[in-house]
Amino acid sequence: AKYPQLLGTLPSKDSGVKYLLEGYLFPATYNYGEDADLESLIDQMLGAMNTNLSSYYSTIEAKNLTVNEVLTLASLVEKEGSTDQDRKDIASVFYNRLNQAMPLQSNIAILYAQGKLGQKTTLKEDAEIDTNIDSPFNVYKKEGLMPGPVDSPSLSALEATINPSKTDYLYFVANVETGAVYFANTYEEHAKNVEEHVNSKLTQSSSSSN
């Protein structure tokens, strides 16, 4: 089979994934002629992901991770943060939570389960997200990772996931409207961050719109 290292841990359809190759096609600009078929384009995108991951396969294996686990985690890191540093710190939060058997509690995975990922989300919508949705992608209710990725992670997200920061962070909250991310080691610190950087902004926006 082509790309055995990349596709060796591809999830099966009965794992609960929506699309088998979700997250495995590298996001980039591709040139193709009018007579190009879908199969050759997919092969080009898989080839690009394989090339970008080729120098990391040994590290992934050394860390006792599978390629699917890395792509799945990187797909969350991709959307949760926008800067390289934030992504490395976010990846560290996810690893720290996984190591302590804490649910990942990512809203990105919920939005994917709802079919809303990619749509603009307001602070209010983010705060009121349905964390009880019945889905294998609900990482509020289940421990561990989703069955597969929710988007195609960029090289920045892949690098952050393979070589994360070393922190004690267990929590983070992002202001979805500004992109700023706030990290915390304890729930108490996290609650303060949520209050200061999210809830206070919600109060301001609701009072200004009344």
Each PLM stretch: what is its role?
Residues 2-210:
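Bacterial extracytoplasmic/cell-wall-associated proteins, especially those involved in peptidoglycan
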